[in-house]
């Protein structure tokens, strides 16, 4: 063998040895990285478990400062019922001094006299990391009920990275905007970013906002569009809120909601639902992806009931005299000493609303309107003007009937009765909010006589007078389950462990 051949052979052997050493070194490094990754994951899980345990014990010790007699009186006065599958002995926060949120949040909530009932009862469970279903009348303070613990959790976790951690899904653009307006006060105070995502407006700014926000409020349709085009990552969401879930299903969003939930964490996610009513479809959906949820109910929810702080006046009228009667009512509720009182008028259909709007303007009234024939910009402007007091007369279809928090509405006028008595209760719930008193004046015609019995039940339940003309239509009502509203919450056993579901 020549010298050159020996050199080549030697070089090949050295190359093989070098490759072998490199491979060994790489395998060793990969093994170490894998071990480090596992240790890091185990450490993180251990830390999360400890934090959850500490959070629970802290929650219980703070709540314990309320006396049992005070708690009993509070539960009785507000007709509070709690169904907790785990049987944990958690008591409500009757005062802000009993709860320990971060300073920035404590400063914001202390501007209010005390927690509302839904806040007082749900906060201890939410701070203990439990899934919660909250059922309460509109105007109950549910946005802070779910928003305060959510934002507090982001800050205390120490992870302020720009990924979506809190997701609130809402049925309408108006309600989503309202929730966002409430939450941005807290996120700004805590140095976090939040955004509101809904349809009817360009996507460009929303895409940019989603990249930077930790808290997102969204309607299902637009959010799903952005998910499908790859503009939003929900894999870091650990706090999910479905607000007005019954309305979302009524609007046909069930499949969208399922697809959205699939994009979030399934194991470490805390899930909440806050609403006024619970149809069968939502109860079944809840049982599929909520983990042993605590059901918190404020007020008597066994039968449909109206806020007792609302004076209900029902007049039986000729259907052709309704608009003339409306002008008479506005002289009573919106002129002279009451000229600056906020009055909300409900029509049933958008064409009716357009006609009534023109008629009111013809008669000299400055009226804002929200209905389907208007653009999103026009609707938002109308709502903002009404909220700000620039225009104190608002005409709306049922798009504004659920969840919108418009402060200081003195009177609700039902020009046309809604399709269900449930919607009637939600409509009149725009007044008498946050402990205030209000008036609801309803025009009822023979065309709605099939709803007379159910309406009489609501009036009787709230201790309101029932006009003789209404009784003539009959007071018997057959107990049935409306297609959009369930009759019984407990049809689904929520104590069962959630099953793995497949989203098509």
UniProtKB/Swiss-Prot annotation:
One of its GO terms (molecular function) is RNA binding. InterPro entries: DEAD/DEAH_box_helicase_dom (IPR011545), Helicase_ATP-bd (IPR014001), Helicase_C-like (IPR001650), P-loop_NTPase (IPR027417), RNA-helicase_DEAD-box_CS (IPR000629). Residues 1-65 are annotated as: Disordered. It is an enzyme of class 3 (hydrolase). Residues 325-474 form the Helicase C-terminal domain. Its main location: nucleus. It holds the Pfam family Helicase_C. ATP-dependent RNA helicase required for 60S ribosomal subunit synthesis. Involved in efficient pre-rRNA processing, predominantly at site A3, which is necessary for the normal formation of 25S and 5.8S rRNAs. This is ATP-dependent RNA helicase DBP3. The lineage of its organism: Eukaryota, Fungi, Dikarya, Ascomycota, Saccharomycotina. The gene is DBP3.
